[in-house]
């Protein structure tokens, strides 16, 4: 299995990448042995872009899952969204993990020991059930503890490979789990998805203002990049006692939480998912929480959010 190199191994730390408009001319290029090669290379649109767009157009629905801050449960929500959509056995679901420096999807989906293999049709994603396929850099690393220390152009190259070289097999839904914030991975996704009919993004937050202030930036990014926002999800919204069913707020809500922010920004509010220790347990063991704990209040709310997203997408057709 080969990851295509887009940045020379002897390039300086802040190399803009050989396909960049600044290749060979940026200040970071001074003293690089490849400077003349990059400076004289032809400029223009990425030659792979038409193929990438064509592959994406074959997928009926494409959803980005975003968060402004790390640790709000974005990957957990991405996994439950994929599990929930896969309950319709006639639908094909793909889950693509582009959190390249911190891939957690393999563990959450229970396939952390698997390796991706190549066939005549391209890379084969890992199937967690007959209609749910997963792809992550975690399947390409020598061990779970291996770090990924990459510049932006190399991340861009891998995301491109995940789209054009993975045999996704006629997907109905592609869920893309992204890193927190607005990083190189997000810019690559915008470049690849903007001409392929992306359905939109689901933004995940927790109730406290320190998370909400970063979500405002994420919403601003989506609007500047012309990415529709399907709605806002408030995660870790209180704790429901499994014995008495009483609810306690873990995070102090000082500015109204996710629901108030959605109203302020003119966005659909999809729901509040309470804390449930069994969610973390399900993720650690690679199980579907909504299958393992169908009577949990959190499970019922997750299913309701998934139904809202699905209904919204069906209305857009």
Swiss-Prot record:
Any GO BP: iron-sulfur cluster assembly
UniProt keyword Ribonucleoprotein present: no
GO molecular-function terms, A-Z: 4 iron, 4 sulfur cluster binding; ATP binding; ATP hydrolysis activity; ATP-dependent FeS chaperone activity; iron-sulfur cluster binding; metal ion binding
GO cellular component labels: cytosol; cytosolic [4Fe-4S] assembly scaffold complex; nucleus
Binding site for [4Fe-4S] cluster 1: 15, 29, 32, 38
Cofactor comment: Binds 4 [4Fe-4S] clusters per heterotetramer. Contains two stable clusters in the N-termini of nbp35 and two labile, bridging clusters between subunits of the nbp35-cfd1 heterotetramer.
Keywords assigned by UniProt, alphabetized: 4Fe-4S, ATP-binding, Cytoplasm, Iron, Iron-sulfur, Metal-binding, Nucleotide-binding
Subcellular location(s) per record: Cytoplasm
Location (main, coarse): cytoplasm
Keyword Cytoplasm in record: yes
Required cofactor(s): [4Fe-4S] cluster
Residues reported to bind [4Fe-4S] cluster 2: 241, 244
Region (Disordered): 1-27
Family, similarity comment: Belongs to the Mrp/NBP35 ATP-binding proteins family. NUBP1/NBP35 subfamily.
Summary of the function given for this chain in its UniProt record: Component of the cytosolic iron-sulfur (Fe/S) protein assembly (CIA) machinery. Required for maturation of extramitochondrial Fe-S proteins. The nbp35-cfd1 heterotetramer forms a Fe-S scaffold complex, mediating the de novo assembly of an Fe-S cluster and its transfer to target apoproteins.
Protein name from the UniProt record: Cytosolic Fe-S cluster assembly factor nbp35
Provenance organism: Schizosaccharomyces pombe (strain 972 / ATCC 24843) (Fission yeast)
């Amino acid at each position: 299995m080969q990851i295509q190199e887009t940045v020379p191994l002897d390039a300086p730390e802040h190399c803009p990448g050989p396909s960049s408009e600044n290749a060979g001319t940026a200040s970071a290029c001074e003293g690089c042995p490849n400077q003349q090669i990059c400076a004289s290379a032809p400029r223009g649109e990425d030659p792979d872009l038409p193929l990438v767009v064509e592959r994406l157009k074959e997928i009926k629905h494409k959803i980005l899952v975003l968060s402004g801050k790390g640790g709000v449960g974005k990957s957990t929500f991405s996994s439950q969204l994929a599990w929930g959509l896969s309950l319709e056995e006639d639908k094909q679901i793909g889950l693509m993990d582009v959190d390249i420096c911190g891939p957690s999807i393999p563990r959450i989906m229970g396939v952390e020991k698997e390796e991706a293999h190549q066939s005549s049709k391209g890379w084969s994603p890992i199937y967690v059930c007959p209609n749910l396929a997963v792809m992550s850099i975690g399947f390409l690393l020598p061990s779970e503890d291996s770090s990924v220390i990459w510049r932006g152009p190399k991340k861009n190259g891998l995301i491109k490979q995940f789209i054009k070289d993975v045999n996704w097999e006629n997907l109905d839904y592609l869920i893309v789990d992204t890193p927190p914030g607005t990083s190189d991975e997000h810019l690559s996704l915008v470049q690849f998805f903007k001409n392929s009919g992306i359905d939109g993004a689901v933004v995940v937050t927790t109730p406290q203002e320190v998370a909400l202030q970063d979500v405002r930036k994420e919403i601003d990014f989506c609007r500047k990049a012309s990415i529709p926002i399907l709605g806002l999800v408030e995660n870790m919204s209180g704790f429901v006692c499994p014995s008495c069913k009483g609810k306690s707020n873990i995070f102090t809500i000082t500015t109204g939480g996710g629901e108030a922010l959605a109203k302020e920004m003119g966005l659909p509010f999809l729901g509040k998912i309470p804390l449930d220790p069994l969610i973390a347990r399900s993720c650690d063991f690679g199980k579907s929480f909504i299958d393992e704990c169908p009577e949990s209040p959190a499970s019922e709310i997750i299913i309701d959010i998934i139904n809202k997203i699905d209904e919204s997408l069906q209305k857009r057709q």
